[in-house]
Amino acid sequence: MAKLTKIIAVITARSGSKGLKNKNILKLKGLPLLAYTITAAKKSNKINRVVLSTDSKLYAKIGSKFGAEIPFIRPKKLATSKSHHPDVVSHAVNFIENKEKIKFSHVVMLQPTSPFRKAHHLDMAINKFLKEKNNSL
């Protein structure tokens, strides 16, 4: 039987942006954009695991530097402009649950393109989600 782990945050950061090349690692006030999302998730009082799903070894290296777990490099079929976030998040969660024989109770999907989101915003959203017993928020 799998042991229950609470909340996982999956940060989705694909390298092949068509509009703004490598937008997820562009510097904002001296830090790569994805660092802000990793930091907020790591500082959250509600999130137990912070995982970066990326197709880029460079993004993985940067993500690891800021404290994200990098359990895999995202498969190419999930790293196209036509890939859907639910498929990417499902891949990440299933990969970890199967590898570690654990089960997450809740999943938080985060994108690096919201750098002004702070840990307390995440905690407020998670509290609202749990209190109202919603399916999603």
Q: Where is each model-derived feature located?
A:
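Conserved donor-nucleotide/metal-binding helix-loop-beta segment in metal-dependent transferases, i.e.
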Residues: 85-87, 92, 96, 118-137
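Short aromatic/hydrophobic "clamp" motif used to bind/position activated sugar donors
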Residues: 107
